[in-house]
UniProtKB/Swiss-Prot annotation:
Transmembrane segments: none
Family: Belongs to the RNR ribonuclease family. RNase II subfamily.
Enzyme class at the top of the EC tree: hydrolase
GO biological process, one term: mRNA catabolic process
Gene that specifies this protein: rnb
Protein name (record): Exoribonuclease 2
Alphabetized GO MF terms: exoribonuclease II activity; RNA binding
Species: Yersinia pestis
């Protein structure tokens, strides 16, 4: 009777049209229910039965209903799924497979099956790559995924590395070597093999890409010659090797090992500036005055060099600091180290006055056993030899930036514009509230930014510095020259690590065109996008492996009385993020661990403080004592508690 009734259809259409709808992102909880967050402002409750249709992170459209004075969201349409490609652990039960995504808020197993091409017989605990293929909001009965790749079995000691690389779709192996020979016969190389070039690196470094030589001019100035390995002498543009390097973009440095951008035979052998081996290089010569100024006599050329010594950071630092456990092999090498130290001091002083110098932060190095277990974490402080190399490389990169800008007008530039113009007023307000007067428009200029940074660096704590970082832009990669506010420089283009950075290889080719007077093509914008994306993925991979190893390392300390000194690095509504200064691990302190009465404690990201009953008890950048309360291995989270 009601079938095909136009009035009923019209009524249904009206009801559908009149039902309020919102678009937002699903936020899951550990208790089965969830919330639909709309524009970060409003959230609507999603009951457990409705949560079975969606997944944490899904962007959906939902209808709104009222139940007992509470607005409830009922998922209706999928806009964008949270999961597409993901990694997880396989569960096998009665020949049926399911996979649990490796994500802290996704705990439900998803039915799955291997794609036809995958021949591996999956077992319980295996790690796999999967692709979502069914979703309840697409009309399917349940979630389902296809297993597209086997990563490793659950017993593999190197799970943190293999799973992380698979998650970010990064390579596990070095590229295969392709027959390569020197291919730049048209490039005239001067013979500098008689000069006393030295390399300074870590003891374990094999891919040495920079060597240094200094000549004392006798008038207080020095002629610095920076020789950089020349992989483009072997890697032809658009060749198979070049396309591989372009895709990888960087050597991927993970705890315990690296995955090179170029085949190891090139990176660690043919191109590496090994001692007493003749190598093709690009060379930059520049006079540095007694005050540390770079003169206008910058000159680039192609050359042959032969490193006379592979020096190690700690050895050189010890010798310069008067610890005689190590000695240079001869007086010529000793003289080079002494002259390099003088250049370092002059350049550092110049940059402190006219540019910006980063505050020294220690590096943390995992000492690993044969099975990937963390034996120890070594704190490596930056010493004088590290600063020597850093000052010489910064000088070389400034020279390249200026030369490319003058001769070509383009290159691969590192650009950082300081404060976000949309947020600079907020930055000025925070500064003013903390007793630092600042003109928003002046902060957007390089001199104004540098003046502020020098003032902040002179303050007794990092509180204000850490407060205003969120108003700054991120460094970018650009094909046109631009300032680098973070370094306090008007232009910066790296070319000193071509073995491990594809952007530096691009700049090598441009510098060669400049040297030979040939026509050069401006790099395509797609290259900068690829470089930025790969840099982001490599950093995430390094962080993820590090989190896994820290969780393994700190698990035995959970629940013990062992105390750690920690620095507060972030304050969120839910608690504090701290960095343990002894080993570099990041831990979370939930607000209830700070004060038992939740209503009396306020953790404010806006003010960078924690208040109890209106009294400030913690501020961002404070150093506090903590104990490890818990280590959650499944999410690699370290939970700490303040020592009372």
């Amino acid at each position: 009777m009601f079938q095909d009734n136009p009035l009923l259809a019209q009524l249904k259409q009206q009801l559908h049209t009149q039902t309020p709808r919102v678009e937002g992102v699903v936020k899951g909880t550990e208790k089965g229910f969830g919330f639909l967050e709309v524009d970060g402002q409003k959230s609507y409750f999603i009951p457990p039965p409705q949560m079975k249709k969606v997944m944490h992170g899904d962007r959906i459209i939902a209808t709104l209903h009222t139940d007992k004075d509470r607005e409830i969201a009922e998922p209706e349409t999928l806009v964008e799924p949270f999961l597409s490609r993901f990694v997880g652990r396989v569960q096998r039960k009665d020949d049926r497979l399911s996979i649990v995504p490796d994500h802290p808020l996704l705990r439900d197993a998803i039915q799955c099956r291997p794609v036809r091409e995958l021949t591996h017989s999956f077992q319980n605990g295996d790690w796999a790559v999967a692709e979502m293929c069914r979703h309840p909001l697409k009309g399917d009965r349940a979630f389902q995924a296809d297993l597209t790749a086997f990563i490793t079995n659950g017993e593999d000691h190197f799970v943190p590395w293999w799973v992380t690389l698979a998650r970010h779709n990064l390579e596990r192996e070095a590229p295969a070597m392709v027959e390569s020979a020197l291919n730049d016969a048209e490039l005239e190389r001067e013979d500098l093999t008689a000069l006393n070039f030295v390399t300074i690196d870590s003891a374990s470094t094999e891919d040495m890409d920079d060597a240094l030589f200094v000549q004392d001019n006798g008038d207080g100035s020095w002629l610095l010659t920076i020789a950089i390995a020349d992989p483009t002498a072997y890697v032809v543009e658009n060749s198979e090797l070049d396309l591989t390097a372009r895709k990888r973009a960087f050597t991927n440095y993970l705890p315990g090992f690296n995955i090179p951008m170029l085949p190891r035979d090139l990176s660690d052998n043919l191109c590496s500036l090994r001692p007493n081996e003749r190598r093709p290089v690009l060379v930059c010569r520049v006079t540095i005055t007694e005050e540390g100024t770079l003169s206008n006599d910058i000159r680039f050329s192609a050359a042959w060099v032969e490193s006379k010594a592979k020096l190690v950071y700690d050895d050189v630092s010890d010798w310069l600091e008067g610890n005689n456990r190590w000695q240079p092999q001869d007086t010529a090498i000793a003289e080079q180290i002494t002259l390099l130290k003088r250049i370092c001091d002059a350049r550092s002083n110049w940059r402190q006055q006219h540019a910006l110098v980063f505050k020294d932060r220690p590096d943390y190095r995992f000492l690993l056993g044969e099975k990937g277990e963390v034996l120890d974490i070594i704190v490596e402080h930056r010493r004088i030899a590290n600063r020597i190399v850093e000052e010489c490389m910064i000088a070389a990169n400034v020279c390249a930036a200026l030369a490319l800008r003058e001769h070509l007008g383009f290159g691969i530039y590192n650009v950082h514009t300081g404060f976000d113009p949309a947020l600079v007023e907020q930055a000025a307000s925070v500064l003013k509230a903390n007793g630092v007067g600042a003109d928003p428009q002046a902060l957007l200029t390089l001199p104004g930014f540098c003046e502020l940074r020098r003032h902040l660096d002179a303050l007794p704590t990092q509180f204000l510095d850490s407060r205003i970082r969120r108003f700054q832009t991120f460094a970018e990669i650009s094909t046109v020259p631009g300032p680098h506010f973070g370094l306090g420089l008007e232009a910066y283009a790296t070319w000193t690590s071509p073995i491990r950075k594809y952007g530096d290889m691009v700049n090598h080719r441009l510098l060669k065109a400049m040297i030979t007077g040939q026509q050069a093509e401006k790099p395509q914008e797609e290259i900068t996008v690829q470089l930025a994306e790969r840099r982001r993925l490599n950093r995430m991979a390094e962080r993820d492996v590090g989190d896994w190893l820290y969780a393994r390392y700190l698990q035995p300390q959970a629940g013990t009385d062992t105390r750690f000194t920690a620095e507060i690095i972030d304050i969120t509504r839910g608690g504090l993020r701290v960095r343990l200064l002894d080993n570099g691990a990041v831990a979370f302190i939930p607000a209830p661990f700070i004060h038992a009465v939740r209503d009396e404690v306020v953790c404010s990201q806006e003010t960078g403080t924690v208040q109890i009953k209106g009294e400030t008890v913690y501020s961002q950048s404070d150093k506090i004592e903590v104990r490890i309360a818990e280590v959650r291995m499944e999410t690699r989270n370290v939970i700490a508690r303040p020592v009372a």
